[in-house]
Amino acid sequence: FAGYPFIAHRIPKTLDSNVHVCAVGSHATAAMHSVRPDFNIEQLIYGLPDYAQESFPVYDISYAGGRPLFVTVGSFEPRKGQDIFCNAIRLLKPEVRQKAAFLFVGKAADKSLKSAVDALVEDYPDTVFYRKRLERPEIKSLMEQCTCIVCASRDDPMPTFVTEGLIFGKPSIVSEHTGTAGLITEGVDGFVYEDDDPEKLAERLAWAIDHPEKLAAMRQACRDLYERHYSKQAFADGLKQAVRELTGESTLSLCQN
């Protein structure tokens, strides 16, 4: 868990009865338990607006050539695992790889990771693409049009770009070291690969590339996952429950207030 060993000395060893701890999913909970195993931690996941109900300009993805488009978004840093995604793409059989398009979006905070992506783009210029930055309306349009989201993070409490994909009914392939992995039902609303292993990610990618119609059929299940865990209403319900447990106040009185 990135960072926790370095801040453990700043985290209280005990909590008073009026202090409750909430975490954004199972991965963040496990991270805290790695340094404070006795803490009782509740789940409280953020809520995102329903971007699918908004209007925004269409972002041009013609470079994908009508092929399934696999997208990852985030600053280039070791924690985000762009190198794992690069290696997985290289491991695909040529006849499989050429049936898809891959887009990396993010600023190059780590030069070695940017070099890995640049090399991949150079080797497969008709298949792999890079954009340093997209504006918010472009991201929304991209999520609406892409086929699948890929999150290869080595440590990621709850990646928001994966959630944004769910808003538009898009399945994801995520590392087990993400908060999203704790909510996905395998093969129903997404896929999880283990051990930060590019070969295991490549296996999921190959299946997804060969079965775009099955990914499309996951749309409603992905949308349901968003509404159940990530919608603004789900967040409001979770926050009210957390406050009720802390104060002993009834849910009815919270709603009235």
Predicted regions and their residues:
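Membrane-proximal helix-turn-helix segments that form the acceptor-binding/catalytic region
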Residues: 1-21
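Aromatic "clamp/platform" in nucleotide-sugar-dependent glycosyltransferases that forms part
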Residues: 154
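Conserved acidic donor-binding segment of nucleotide-sugar-dependent glycosyltransferases
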Residues: 186-187, 191-198, 207-212
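Conserved donor-binding/catalytic core segment of Leloir-type glycosyltransferases
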Residues: 22, 62-80, 86-89, 103
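Short alpha-helical donor nucleotide-sugar binding micro-motif in glycosyltransferases
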Residues: 133, 141-146
